[in-house]
Amino acid sequence: MTGLIYNQHDIPKDVYRYGLRPSAQTGCGWIATYNALKLLGCTTDIPELIRYFTWQLPVIHGNLGTAFWAPRQCFRKWGFDTELIFDRRRFDEKAAEADAGIVFYHWAGKRGTGAHFVALQKTPEGFTGYNTFRNSTGPDCWGTSVDGFLRQHRYFGCVLLCIRKK
């Protein structure tokens, strides 16, 4: 799969700003949406996608990132069948049934706390995430369990968006 964004920190600070900040800081929501669209075989104009999120579904116009429900609103508007899953025990089953997914989670560490979006897909090897880590250079192997990966990394407050093709 080409054209995916593997690491938002590789986006130059003056390219693809999200609100008043660079996408490298707060752009994971639109990036996960973009990557999920690519996984679904769709194309989109990045500046147009950013404008959509910045003015219609922002958290303070993108300055604090994207609300967890915003990508679902986009995919529903575009005619995709979507489902939000809040019970992590159902993540593996539901993610395996989806054509693409987006996981939203919170993290805590030395740098404080924050939240992140990652595009996800089921592959023959297990689950693969895109733009998972600060040092990601390509697709990230999540293993055979989405829930297991999230638990291993101590991520919390997780929501899975399952997306099925039109």
Language-model segments: residues:
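Active-site-adjacent structural segments surrounding the nucleophilic cysteine of cysteine proteases
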Residues: 1-60
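Conserved active-site-adjacent core of cysteine acyl-enzyme catalytic domains
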Residues: 2, 43-165
